C-alpha cells in the first residue's frame, strides 16, 4: 500500500493544476499527510497564463485567486472539496472558426477524466511511486504484474465522483479590441457530483458590463505606454490579413522569454504582462447589459453526453448588446473552409443531447441599473419571452410559451388564441406562441396564434432604430470584407416550412391585416395584405422571386400627409442609427460570423414582381381624385433596380366639361420607367415611351386663393423641419442628385375650345435634379420635334404603338436640337430658368401657321378677373384743347422760329444723320450750337417741332451751309480736373422726364422679381415657309370652291359678250378669277404655287400639297431673351403703374432668304452693308416690352414697347412679296379671334434706314383703276432706293394688327411727301446717272468738307478729285457690264428655240417681264431656281478674264455643234424645203451664239474690274443674287 500516498499526492497535484494552475507548484514540495482528512489553503495565488486552458477564442493575460482551500477525505465518502473565493482573470479574444470552437467546447467538458488517467498511466509511474512490483503482493487478485488500467480508471472515477467545487466572486475582464472592454461577474459557481457519471453545475448571479463609447467618445484614451499595443497586429493561423489584435505584445513577450533562465524569464514575463495590461481603461464607465439570476446544468458524462439546463430570469440591454454579441463571437477565417481535424471527423454523427428551459428573457433598449433592473422601462419598449423550452439532438425543438412587447403596462405586440364562438364548444387557446423544429434536413416554424399589436410612432422609431443599427453594423463589415474569399456553398439543401396565423396590427391608427402565411419547400403563399385602404392580393415567393398579382388602393391627401409626417421621424431615426459610430470590434470582426448574420437578411438576389397596381388618390381641393394604374412592376435587390412596364395616371374631367382623360399613359408596350438604386440611393431614373397629356382646363385645378393659402400653410409647416434636417445632413454629406433620362416620350398639348392638337416629341433628354437644399434641375435636350394637327378627332390611334400614329398622322412643324435648360429656386429668391440652344426650326404652311398661332393662344388659361377692366370718367366740359399746342407749329416757313424751337428739346429729333445722310456739314454745325433744354414740353409740341426741323433740313441750301463759320479747335476749353471733382459737384446730364403715361420708367415701381426666364443664347432660329397647305380641310375647301365656280360658269348664258369674270376669295388670301372654265386649274396653281412650272399632267390636288422645299426662309441668329415676372395681375396692393413683367429680346442677325424659283434674288432682307461694319456687340433688332397695371383698382394691363432696328437692305421680288402677303393673310374660318386684344399704351420705334431693290413682275390694272396708287410701283424697277422710316411714338393702340396699319399709314405719306427724291433716284434707268452725279457732287462737296476741317486747299482738291475719279470709273464700268448683260438677254430671247431644245420647262409667259436680267442655269426638279447673270461675279481682273475665256469658249462650242449638225441635216434632207428649214433653224444658233459669248465675256471682265476697284461690290452681289452652287 506504499503507492497510496503517491496516488493521493498525484490526485491532489492534479486537482490543483486543473483548477488553479498555480505558478511554480512542484509535486516534491507538496507535503501531504495521510489521514481521514487532509486540508490545504493558499492565498493570493497567481495563475500561470501559459498553463491555463480557457474556452475557445480566448487566452489569459493574467490571473489571481484571493483564497484557495482544498480538503480531501478518503474515508466517510466526503471526497475532495475545493473552495475558491475571489477569482480575478484578465483575458483577450483570439480568432478561431466556428467548427473549432464547437469541438473545443465539447472537448473541454470531457477531457478531465482522460487527463487524469494520462497522468496516472505515465511512463515514470513506477519510479514516481517508488514501488517494486516483485515485492508488492497481489492486490485484489490482479497478480504481480502491476496496476491495471481498469483499476486506475475506476479509482479515478471514484475520486471524481466525490469531487465538489465551490467558486465565489468570479471577476473576468475581457478585452475584445483596442477600444472594447467587458466585465463578467459571477456570484457563485457550484459543481456537485450526483452519483454515477452525472454532475450538477449551479451558477448564480451572472452579470455583464461593457464600456459605453457614447460616454467617452469614439476611441478609448490610451496611455503613452500602450500606444504601440493599439497599433500592433495580431498574428494568428487565420488567412485574414485585415483582423488585428492589440494585445499581441503579451504573447510576443512570452515567446521571447524562453531563451532566459527560469528566474529571468519569469521576471521578463511579468513585466510584459504589466506593460500590456496598462491600457488606461480603469476610468472608463461601464454599464450593465446582461444578467442571469440562476443557471442549473445537469451533465451526464458518458459516451453520449446528455445535458439538461434550466435558466431562470434573463435580462439583456439592446442598447449595447449588439456590440457585445459581435465582439464575443469574434470568429474569423481560421478554418480553411472544408478541412476538418481527425478528431472532428471521428465525432461526426454524434450529437449532444440537450434539454433546456428558460423561465423568461427580457430585453429592452434601455440600460440595466445597479440593481440589474431596467431603467426608464415605462418609456421604452420591453421585449419579453417566457416559458421557453427546447431540446437538441438529432432533432432540435424550441417552444416559446409567451412572446410579447410592452411599453410600461401597455401591450404593444403579442399573440392571442383563436376563439371559436359556438354554442357547443368552449374557447380552446393554444399553449405556445412560437414553435420551432429543426434538423439537418428540415426547418419548421409555426405561429399557431393570431399576432396582434398596436404600434405608435415612438414604438416604430425604437424598432426601426434598432434594426437599422444592426444592419449598419453588418454593412460596415461587408464593406471591409469585400475582398475576402467567396462564400462557400452550403452542403445539401434543407426543407423549410413556415405556418402562421393572421396578423392584426394597428400602426399609428391605421389597420394592417395580414392573412396566414404558408412557406413550404421554398415556396411562400399569402393571399392578402391590407393596410388601411391599400390591399395587396396574391403574394407568392419561390426561388428568391416574390410575385404579387394585384395591388388596390384608395387613399386621400390627408392620409398621404399623415403618412409623410409618420415617416419623417422614422427616417430621421434610421439616419441617426446609421450615423452611430461602428465599434472597432465590428470592423475587425471575422467575415464568417457576419456571413451567418448576413444570410437571413441578404436580399441581393431577391426579385419582387407585381403584375398590376391600381388605385385612387384623393389629393383634395380642386385636384380631386387621381387614378393610378401601374403594370409589370419588377423590383430587384430590392435596392438595385425598379422597373415599371406601364404607367397610367388619369382623372375624370367631367367637372371641367371633359370626359375621363389619361394624363400619363404609355406609347408602346415596353418598359416605361426604370429606377436604378445603389445602397438605397437613386442612381438613375429612365423613362421611355411615355406620353404626358396637357389640357388647358387642368390649370383651373391649381388656381384659386384657397389652394394657394393651403399650399403656403403646408410649406410653412414643413419647411423649417425639412430645412433644418437638410442643413444638418448637408454638412455631413453632399447634396443628393437624381439623374433622369427620357427617351422617345411625348407631351400632348390640347388647347381649350379648339379641335387642334400638338405632340411635343423628345428623342433624348438627360436631367439632373437636386431636390435639396435648394431645388435645381439641369436638362439637356438632344433633339425634339413638334407635331401638329388641325382636328384631333381625325386621328386613328394604334393602341400598341401610339408613336407611329403620331408620326404618320400629324404634321411636323418645329424641331430643336442641343438645348439645355436649367431651373433653380430657393426660398426668398426668384425662380430662375436659363435656356441655351443650338438650332430651332419652324416649317409651316399658311394654314398650319395660323393653327399653330391659335393653339399657342389657346393654351393660355382663361383668367377670371376679380375686378372690372374699364371705368368711365367724366371730363371737364370746359377743357381747353389748344392748351398744349405750340404757336410756332403754324409758322413753319419762319426759320428763326424754327431755329429757336429746335434748341428746346432734342428728344424726338435724334439720328439727324439718318434723316439727311449726305448733309454732314449741317450735322457738325447742329451739334456745335445745341444747348440743353431748360423747359419741359408736351408730346404734341415735340411732334410739331420734329416736323418743323424736317422741313427746315429739306429746305436748307448747300451754299448756305458752306458759308457757315467752321468750328475752330482753339475755341474748345478743356477742364483738366473735371474727373477729380467730388460726385456731388459734377453736373448731371439727364433726359427730360417722360410723359405721365410712362409710369413703368420709375424704379420705384419695380418689385423684386418672382420668376426670371433667361434665354442666354439660341444660335439659330430658322423659319421655313412652304407653299401649299398642310390640312386636308383647306385643300377640300379650295377644291370645293373651284368646283362651285365651274358649276356657276357652266350655268351662265353663253350669249354674254364680253365674257364675265368669275371671282371668289378663299381664306382671305386666295383670289380666284377666271373667264373660262379651263383656266380655273391654272389659276389655282398660280395662286398656290406661282413659282412652279405648269405641267399638264400635274393634278390640282398635287399643287395644293405642301412644297418639298421652302419658298422663304427667315434666319434669326444670336437670339437672347430675358423675361422677368414681378407681380401678377390679381396681386393685391399694387401701386398704379406697377410693372407686372418685362421682356427684353435681342437678335444679332436677321435675314430673309428668297427661295422662290422664279426669283433670281437671294436675300429678301439683310443688314445694309453700305453703312459699314457694325459696332462690337451691336444687335440688329432690340425689342423691350413691359406689361404695366395702369390703375390699381382695375384688372387690366397695358403694354409699353420700344423697338430699335439697324439699317435694312431689301431685295424684293414681286413673286416673293405676293407669296408672303398670301401666306400671312391666310385666315382659317374655324379659328376664332382672341376675345381680348392687347392694349398698347405706348409704342416707340426709332428711325430705320432702308435701301430697297424692287423687281415687279405684273401689274394689277383693276386695282389701279380702283385707286390703289401703290400699283404704280409695279411699272418701275427700283435699285438702291433710299428712305428712312422715321421714329414714331404711338399711344393708345388696340391690338398689334392695328399697330401695323398705323405704322403703314404714317410712314407711307411721310416717304411720299419728304423722301420721294431718294425713292425715285432708285429707278433702274436713272440709278447709273444718279451715281455718276454723285461722283460729280463729290468733286465739290469733298474739297469743301476737307477744307473746313484743316484749311488745306491742295489736299482737299486732291481728295475730291480722287473721290470723283473712283466713283465715276466704278459706275462707268458697272454700267458697261449692265449693258453687256442686257444685250446678252436680248440675244438669248431671239434664240428661244434653243431653249426649248435644252428641255426648258418654263413657258414663254414666265419670261414676259419688265426685266430680263436672268437666264436659265442649273434648273432641275430638285433645285428649281433661276440664276441671274449678275451672280457669281469674279473677285478681280484675273478671275474675270478666266471666266470670260470659259464663257466665250462654251458658246463657241455650242455654235460649232450647231454648224456640224446643220451639215448632217442638209445631207439627210430629201427636198430643198427641208434643207432650207434646217438652215433657218440652225442659223440663229450659229450666228448669235458667238455674239452671246462675246457679251458674256465682256460682262465677266467688267465685273472683275469693278470688284477689283471696289471689293465690297462682291459681297453686295452675293447678298442680292442667287448663286449656282
Curated annotation (Swiss-Prot):
GO terms for biological process: autophagosome assembly; autophagy of mitochondrion; glycophagy; lipid transport; pexophagy; piecemeal microautophagy of the nucleus; protein transport; reticulophagy. Residues 220-230 have a biased composition (Polar residues). Its main location: membrane. Residues 216-247, 712-738 are annotated as: Disordered. Residues 716-733 have a biased composition (Low complexity). Belongs to the ATG2 family. This is Autophagy-related protein 2.
Amino acid at each position: 500500500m506504499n503507492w497510496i500516498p503517491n496516488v493521493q499526492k498525484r490526485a491532489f497535484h492534479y486537482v490543483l493544476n486543473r483548477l488553479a494552475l498555480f505558478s511554480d507548484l512542484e509535486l516534491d514540495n507538496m507535503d501531504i499527510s495521510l489521514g481521514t482528512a487532509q486540508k490545504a489553503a493558499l492565498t493570493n495565488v497567481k495563475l500561470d497564463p501559459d498553463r491555463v486552458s480557457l474556452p475557445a477564442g480566448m487566452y489569459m493575460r493574467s490571473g489571481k485567486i484571493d483564497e484557495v482551500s482544498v480538503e480531501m477525505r478518503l474515508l466517510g465518502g466526503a471526497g475532495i472539496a475545493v473552495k475558491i473565493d475571489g477569482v480575478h482573470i484578465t483575458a483577450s479574444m483570439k480568432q478561431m472558426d466556428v467548427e473549432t470552437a464547437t469541438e473545443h467546447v465539447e472537448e473541454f467538458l470531457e477531457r478531465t477524466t482522460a487527463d487524469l488517467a494520462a497522468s496516472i498511466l505515465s511512463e515514470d509511474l513506477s519510479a514516481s511511486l517508488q514501488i517494486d512490483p516483485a515485492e508488492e503482493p497481489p492486490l485484489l487478485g490482479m497478480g504481480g504484474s502491476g496496476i491495471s488500467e481498469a483499476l486506475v480508471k475506476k479509482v479515478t472515477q471514484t475520486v471524481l465522483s466525490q469531487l465538489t467545487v465551490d467558486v465565489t466572486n468570479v471577476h473576468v475582464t475581457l478585452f475584445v479590441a483596442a477600444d472594447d472592454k467587458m466585465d463578467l461577474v459571477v456570484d457563485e459557481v457550484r459543481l456537485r457530483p450526483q452519483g454515477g457519471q452525472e454532475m450538477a453545475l449551479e451558477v448564480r448571479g451572472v452579470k455583464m458590463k461593457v464600456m459605453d463609447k457614447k460616454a467617452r467618445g469614439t476611441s478609448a484614451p490610451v496611455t503613452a505606454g500602450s500606444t504601440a499595443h493599439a497599433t500592433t497586429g495580431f498574428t494568428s493561423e487565420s488567412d485574414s490579413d485585415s483582423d488585428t489584435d492589440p494585445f499581441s505584445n503579451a504573447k510576443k513577450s512570452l515567446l521571447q522569454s524562453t531563451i532566459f533562465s527560469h528566474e529571468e524569464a519569469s521576471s521578463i514575463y511579468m513585466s510584459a504582462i504589466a506593460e500590456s495590461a496598462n491600457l488606461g481603461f480603469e476610468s472608463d464607465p461601464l454599464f450593465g447589459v446582461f444578467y442571469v439570476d440562476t443557471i442549473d446544468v445537469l451533465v451526464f458524462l458518458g459516451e453520449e453526453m446528455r445535458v439538461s439546463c434550466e435558466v431562470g430570469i434573463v435580462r439583456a440591454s439592446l442598447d449595447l448588446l449588439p456590440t457585445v454579441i459581435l465582439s464575443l463571437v469574434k470568429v474569423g477565417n481560421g478554418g480553411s473552409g472544408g478541412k476538418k481535424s481527425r478528431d472532428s471527423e471521428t465525432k461526426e454523427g454524434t450529437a449532444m443531447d440537450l434539454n433546456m428551459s428558460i423561465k423568461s428573457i427580457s430585453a429592452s433598449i434601455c440600460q440595466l441599473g445597479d440593481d440589474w433592473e431596467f431603467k426608464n422601462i415605462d418609456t421604452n419598449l420591453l421585449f419579453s419571452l417566457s416559458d421557453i423550452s427546447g431540446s437538441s439532438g438529432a432533432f432540435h425543438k424550441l417552444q416559446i410559451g409567451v412572446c410579447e412587447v410592452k411599453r410600461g403596462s401597455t401591450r404593444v405586440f403579442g399573440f392571442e388564441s383563436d376563439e371559436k364562438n359556438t354554442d357547443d364548444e368552449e374557447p380552446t387557446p393554444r399553449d405556445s406562441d412560437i414553435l420551432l423544429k429543426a434538423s439537418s434536413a428540415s426547418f419548421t416554424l409555426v405561429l399557431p396564434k393570431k399576432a396582434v399589436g398596436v404600434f405608435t410612432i415612438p414604438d416604430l422609431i425604437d424598432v426601426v432604430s434598432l434594426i437599422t443599427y444592426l444592419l449598419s453594423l453588418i454593412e460596415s463589415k461587408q464593406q471591409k470584407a469585400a475582398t475576402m474569399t467567396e462564400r462557400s456553398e452550403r452542403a445539401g439543401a434543407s426543407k423549410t416550412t413556415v405556418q402562421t396565423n393572421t396578423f392584426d396590427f394597428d400602426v399609428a391608427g391605421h389597420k394592417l391585416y395580414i392573412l396566414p402565411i404558408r412557406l413550404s419547400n421554398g415556396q411562400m403563399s399569402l393571399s392578402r395584405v391590407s393596410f388601411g385602404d391599400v390591399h395587396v392580393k396574391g403574394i407568392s415567393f419561390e426561388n428568391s422571386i416574390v410575385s404579387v398579382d394585384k395591388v388596390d388602393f384608395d387613399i386621400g391627401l390627408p392620409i398621404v400627409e399623415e403618412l409623410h409626417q409618420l415617416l419623417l421621424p422614422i427616417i430621421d431615426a434610421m439616419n441617426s442609427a446609421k450615423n452611430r459610430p461602428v465599434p472597432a470590434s465590428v470592423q475587425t470582426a471575422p467575415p464568417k460570423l457576419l456571413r451567418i448574420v448576413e444570410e437571413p437578411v441578404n436580399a441581393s438576389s431577391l426579385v419582387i414582381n407585381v403584375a398590376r397596381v391600381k388605385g385612387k388618390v384623393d389629393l383634395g381641393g380642386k385636384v380631386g381624385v387621381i387614378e393610378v394604374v401601374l403594370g409589370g412592376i419588377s423590383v430587384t435587390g430590392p435596392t438595385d433596380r425598379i422597373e415599371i412596364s406601364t404607367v397610367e395616371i388619369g382623372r375624370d374631367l367631367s367637372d371641367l366639361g371633359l370626359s375621363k382623360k389619361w394624363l400619363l399613359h404609355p406609347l408602346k408596350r415596353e418598359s416605361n420607367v426604370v429606377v436604378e438604386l445603389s445602397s438605397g440611393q437613386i442612381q438613375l431614373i429612365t423613362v421611355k415611351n411615355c406620353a404626358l397629356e396637357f389640357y388647358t382646363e387642368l390649370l383651373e385645378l391649381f388656381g384659386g386663393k384657397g389652394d394657394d393659402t393651403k399650399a403656403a400653410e403646408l410649406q410653412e409647416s414643413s419647411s423649417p423641419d425639412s430645412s433644418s434636417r437638410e442643413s444638418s445632413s448637408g454638412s455631413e454629406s453632399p447634396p443628393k442628385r437624381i439623374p433622369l433620362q427620357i427617351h422617345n416620350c411625348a407631351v400632348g398639348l390640347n388647347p381649350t375650345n379648339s379641335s387642334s392638337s400638338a405632340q411635343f416629341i423628345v428623342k433624348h433628354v438627360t436631367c439632373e435634379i437636386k431636390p435639396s437644399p435648394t431645388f435645381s434641375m439641369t436638362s439637356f435636350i438632344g433633339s425634339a420635334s413638334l407635331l401638329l394637327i388641325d382636328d384631333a378627332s381625325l386621328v386613328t390611334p394604334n393602341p400598341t404603338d401610339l408613336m407611329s400614329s403620331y408620326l404618320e398622322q400629324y404634321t411636323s412643324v418645329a424641331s430643336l436640337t442641343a438645348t439645355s435648360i436649367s431651373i433653380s429656386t430657393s426660398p426668398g429668391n426668384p425662380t430662375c430658368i436659363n435656356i441655351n440652344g443650338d438650332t430651332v426650326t419652324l416649317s409651316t404652311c399658311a394654314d398650319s401657321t395660323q393653327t399653330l398661332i391659335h393653339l399657342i393662344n389657346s393654351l393660355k388659361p382663361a383668367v377670371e378677373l376679380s375686378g372690372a377692366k374699364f371705368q368711365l370718367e367724366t371730363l371737364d366740359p370746359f377743357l381747353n384743347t389748344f392748351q398744349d399746342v405750340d404757336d410756332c407749329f403754324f409758322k413753319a416757313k419762319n426759320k428763326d422760329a424754327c431755329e429757336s424751337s429746335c434748341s428746346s428739346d432734342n428728344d424726338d429729333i435724334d439720328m439727324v444723320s439718318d434723316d439727311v445722310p449726305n448733309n454732314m456739314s449741317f450735322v457738325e454745325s447742329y451739334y456745335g450750337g445745341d444747348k440743353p433744354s431748360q423747359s419741359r414740353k408736351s408730346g404734341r409740341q415735340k411732334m410739331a417741332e420734329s416736323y418743323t426741323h424736317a422741313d427746315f433740313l429739306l429746305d436748307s441750301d448747300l451754299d448756305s451751309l458752306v458759308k457757315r463759320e467752321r468750328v475752330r479747335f482753339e475755341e474748345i476749353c478743356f477742364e483738366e480736373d473735371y474727373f477729380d471733382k467730388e460726385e456731388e459737384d459734377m453736373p448731371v446730364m439727364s433726359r427730360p422726364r417722360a410723359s405721365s403715361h410712362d409710369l413703368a420708367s420709375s424704379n420705384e415701381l419695380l418689385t423684386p422679381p418672382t420668376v426670371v426666364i433667361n434665354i442666354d443664347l439660341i444660335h439659330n432660329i430658322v423659319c421655313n415657309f412652304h407653299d401649299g397647305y398642310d390640312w386636308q380641310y383647306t385643300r377640300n375647301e379650295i377644291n370645293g370652291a373651284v368646283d362651285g365656280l365651274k358649276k356657276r360658269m357652266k350655268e351662265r348664258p353663253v350669249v354674254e359678250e364680253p365674257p364675265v369674270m368669275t371671282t371668289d376669295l378663299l381664306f382671305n388670301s386666295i383670289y380666284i378669277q377666271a373667264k373660262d372654265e379651263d383656266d380655273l386649274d391654272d389659276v389655282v396653281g398660280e395662286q398656290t404655287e406661282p413659282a412652279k412650272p405648269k405641267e399638264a399632267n400635274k393634278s390640282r390636288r398635287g399643287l395644293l400639297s405642301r412644297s418639298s422645299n421652302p419658298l422663304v426662309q427667315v434666319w434669326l441668329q444670336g437670339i437672347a431673351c430675358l423675361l422677368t415676372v414681378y407681380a401678377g395681375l390679381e396681386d393685391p396692393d399694387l401701386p398704379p403703374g406697377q410693372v407686372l413683367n418685362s421682356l427684353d429680346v435681342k437678335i444679332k442677325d436677321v435675314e430673309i432668304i428668297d427661295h422662290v424659283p422664279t426669283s433670281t434674288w437671294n436675300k429678301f432682307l439683310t443688314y445694309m452693308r453700305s453703312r459699314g461694319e457694325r459696332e462690337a456687340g451691336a444687335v440688329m433688332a432690340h425689342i423691350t416690352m413691359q406689361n404695366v397695371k395702369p390703375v390699381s383698382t382695375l384688372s387690366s394691363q397695358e403694354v409699353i414697347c420700344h423697338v430699335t432696328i439697324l439699317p435694312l437692305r431689301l431685295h424684293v421680288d414681286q413673286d416673293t412679296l405676293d407669296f408672303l402677303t398670301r401666306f400671312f393673310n391666310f385666315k382659317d374660318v374655324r379659328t376664332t379671334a382672341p376675345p381680348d386684344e392687347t392694349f398698347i399704351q405706348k409704342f416707340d420705334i426709332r428711325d430705320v434706314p432702308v435701301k430697297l431693290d424692287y423687281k415687279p413682275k405684273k401689274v394689277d390694272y383693276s386695282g389701279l383703276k380702283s385707286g390703289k396708287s401703290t400699283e404704280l410701283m409695279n411699272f418701275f424697277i427700283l435699285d438702291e432706293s433710299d428712305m428712312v422710316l422715321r421714329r414714331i411714338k404711338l399711344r393708345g393702340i388696340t391690338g398689334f394688327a392695328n399697330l401695323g396699319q398705323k405704322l403703314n399709314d404714317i410712314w407711307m405719306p411721310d416717304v411720299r411727301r419728304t423722301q420721294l427724291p431718294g425713292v425715285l433716284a432708285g429707278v433702274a434707268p436713272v440709278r447709273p446717272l444718279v451715281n455718276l452725279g454723285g461722283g460729280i457732287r463729290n468733286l465739290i462737296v469733298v474739297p469743301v468738307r476737307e477744307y473746313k476741317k484743316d484749311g488745306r486747299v491742295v489736299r482737299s482738291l486732291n481728295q475730291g478729285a480722287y473721290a470723283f475719279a473712283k466713283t465715276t470709273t466704278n459706275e462707268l464700268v458697272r454700267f458697261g457690264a449692265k449693258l453687256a448683260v442686257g444685250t446678252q438677254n436680248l440675244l438669248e430671247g431671239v434664240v428661244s428655240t434653243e431653249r426649248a431644245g435644252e428641255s426648258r420647262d418654263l413657258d414663254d409667259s414666265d419670261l414676259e417681264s419688265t426685266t430680263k436680267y436672268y437666264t436659265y442655269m442649273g434648273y432641275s426638279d430638285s433645285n428649281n431656281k433661276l440664276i441671274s447673270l449678275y451672280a457669281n461675279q469674279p473677285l478681280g481682273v484675273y478671275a474675270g478674264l478666266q471666266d470670260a475665256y470659259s464663257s466665250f469658249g462654251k458658246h463657241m462650242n455650242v455654235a460649232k455643234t450647231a454648224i456640224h449638225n446643220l451639215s448632217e441635216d442638209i445631207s439627210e434632207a430629201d427636198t430643198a424645203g427641208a434643207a432650207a428649214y434646217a438652215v433657218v433653224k440652225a442659223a440663229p444658233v450659229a450666228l448669235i451664239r458667238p455674239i452671246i459669248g462675246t457679251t458674256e465675256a465682256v460682262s465677266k471682265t467688267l465685273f472683275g474690274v469693278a470688284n477689283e476697284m471696289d471689293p465690297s461690290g462682291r459681297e453686295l452681289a452675293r447678298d442680292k443674287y442667287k448663286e449656282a452652287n
